[in-house]
Regions:
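Mid-to-C-terminal alpha-helical segments outside catalytic/metal-binding sites
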Residues: 2-57, 66-83, 93, 258-273, ...
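Alpha-helical scaffolding within the catalytic cores
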Residues: 42, 68, 90-97, 118-122, ...
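Acidic (Asp/Glu)-rich catalytic clusters
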Residues: 46-50, 73-78, 95-105, 122-130, ...
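Hydrophobic faces of well-ordered beta-strands that scaffold small-molecule active sites
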Residues: 55-59, 83-86, 108-110, 134-135, ...
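Active-site gating/metal-coordination segments in enzymes
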Residues: 90-185, 234-235
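His/Asp/Glu-enriched short active-site or ligand-binding loop at hydrolase and phosphoryl-transfer sites
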Residues: 227-240
Length: 320
């Protein structure tokens, strides 16, 4: 578990540094969004209200930082941001208590060792403590659709939970020794079967299957309970060709391509939700990257609002 946490921290630190060097061109898009938040405040709407609120589906609790919750709350207040805080099982009490004290800022999610003999009991305990879902599931030894994982999915289905899965390429943490890790076990195509077998689970895929964006998008298109984020390296490596995503999220949701979407939004990009997967200092840069994508792909304002928070607010029934 410690190796896993180290890998996650290293990845977020690296991606945060990489993204920070590529975002000057997108500052204008975020500036407009930030202005809308300021206008909301001037209209007498408190920062903790749902108006203009960002919901970040991909914030990893960092147990190595004793002031992490306090530091997060400062960022949360400044950006008007709520986090689905992905929490190691051993840190569940800290985050559960923080979520009780700050219900409009922290939504507790737990990740468990799928190979622990008491993993189902761990899931049940998280549920009893008020956790709202699982994530980020990753570094699995078998594909996500392996029946050995089904008892966990069955509990999540029973609870109507949201479950976040890593999808796509994954970093390599060890170079001089064998490592039982393979991206092929975490391909986005596996999420289709989970979504169909367990229809009460809302399936979130991190990183939009990087680099299998086409598979991720088509699975999200035909499964109303599947969404993806674009955290990680995608918006950095695609910064000069962001409009390419219009060819991936291509459908209109009308006519022969009509599918069930949040609020019947016909824009294909509504199947994306915001996720940062970076350090606290890097979240604002990822927001800018999303807005650069919106501008490049001419995503309409109502769809932008759903991506940045509206969809998850409705799915989770978050307080205002």
């Amino acid at each position: 578990m410690m190796n896993k946490m180290f890998s996650q921290f290293s990845r977020r630190k690296f991606l945060g540094a990489a993204g920070a060097t590529t975002l000057l061109s997108s500052a204008r898009g975020f500036g407009a969004y930030a202005s809308s938040l300021n206008n909301s405040a001037s209209d007498g709407v408190p920062a903790s209200s749902g108006k203009g609120r960002i919901v970040d589906m991909h914030v990893h609790f960092d147990a190595k930082k004793p002031n992490y919750i306090e530091d997060f709350l400062k960022v949360s207040e400044r950006l008007n941001l709520t986090a689905l805080m992905l929490t190691p099982f051993e840190n569940r009490k800290v985050v559960a208590e923080a979520a009780k004290q700050h219900p409009t800022r922290i939504v507790p999610f737990g990740y468990v060792d799928l190979y622990a003999p008491d993993v189902v009991q761990q899931v049940e305990e998280l549920h009893s403590m008020g956790f709202r879902g699982l994530g980020e599931l990753e570094f699995v030894k078998k594909p996500y659709i392996d029946p050995n994982y089904f008892p966990v999915y069955e509990r999540a289905n029973e609870y109507g939970w949201v479950v976040l899965f890593h999808t796509g390429i994954v970093l390599r943490a060890k170079f001089n020794e064998p490592e039982d890790v393979a991206s092929g076990r975490m391909r986005p195509i596996h999420l289709e079967e989970i979504a169909r077998r367990f229809p009460k689970i809302t399936v979130l895929g991190a990183h939009c299957g990087n680099p299998e964006y086409q598979w991720a998008a088509e699975i999200a298109r035909w499964n109303s309970n599947v969404f993806f984020d674009l955290s990680g390296s995608s918006l950095t490596k695609m910064q000069r060709r962001l409009s390419t995503f219009r060819e991936i999220f291509w459908w209109t949701g009308e006519g022969d391509s009509q599918v069930k979407t949040p609020d019947n939004d016909p824009n294909a990009f509504v199947k994306i939700v915001f996720g940062s997967d970076t350090s606290l200092e890097g979240i604002e840069n990822v927001i800018k990257q999303y807005h650069a994508l919106f501008d490049a792909c001419e995503v309409p304002e109502p769809t932008r609002n759903r991506i940045m928070g509206g969809t998850l607010i409705n799915l989770l029934g978050l307080p205002g």
